[in-house]
């Protein structure tokens, strides 16, 4: 298998936003530095997101990544926490199922 690429696999399970926990899909528009990002959310709001340390150490978050965010209880229209980042295969699945219609 050396030098050969494995065929793309369908994701077996994709995490979707939990509405009872106030989670929203979003797309990272801009990296601001100091673990902060600007996120365009599916409810039409532009929020400043914070990447928590446990997520920051595990995965890299870049511009145009699709993420799940939770708005803060105070200043919920302005600030949020990034809690999940989707891979390319998961984004394709979300697109097919209609979750990413807000991006169009």
Swiss-Prot record:
It comes from the Archaea. One of its GO terms (molecular function) is RNA binding. The keyword Nucleotide-binding does not apply. Residues 1-14 have a biased composition (Low complexity). Keywords: Initiation factor, Protein biosynthesis. Residues 12-87 form the S1-like domain. Residues 1-20 are annotated as: Disordered. SUPFAM superfamilies: Nucleic acid-binding proteins. InterPro entries: NA-bd_OB-fold (IPR012340), RNA-binding_domain_S1_IF1 (IPR006196), TIF_eIF-1A (IPR001253), TIF_eIF-1A_CS (IPR018104). Belongs to the eIF-1A family. Seems to be required for maximal rate of protein biosynthesis. Enhances ribosome dissociation into subunits and stabilizes the binding of the initiator Met-tRNA(I) to 40 S ribosomal subunits. PANTHER family: EIF-1A (PTHR21668). This is Translation initiation factor 1A. It comes from Methanococcus maripaludis (strain C7 / ATCC BAA-1331). The lineage of its organism: Archaea, Methanobacteriati, Methanobacteriota, Methanomada group, Methanococci.
């Amino acid at each position: 298998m050396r030098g050969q690429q494995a065929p793309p696999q369908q994701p077996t399970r994709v995490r979707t936003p939990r509405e009872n926990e106030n989670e929203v899909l979003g797309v990272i528009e801009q990296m601001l530095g100091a673990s902060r990002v600007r996120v365009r959310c599916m409810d039409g709001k532009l929020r400043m997101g914070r990447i928590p340390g446990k997520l920051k150490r595990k995965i890299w978050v870049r511009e145009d990544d699709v993420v799940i965010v939770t708005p803060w209880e105070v200043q919920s229209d302005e600030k949020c926490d990034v809690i999940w980042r989707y891979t390319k295969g998961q984004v394709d699945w979300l697109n097919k199922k209609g979750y990413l219609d807000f991006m169009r």
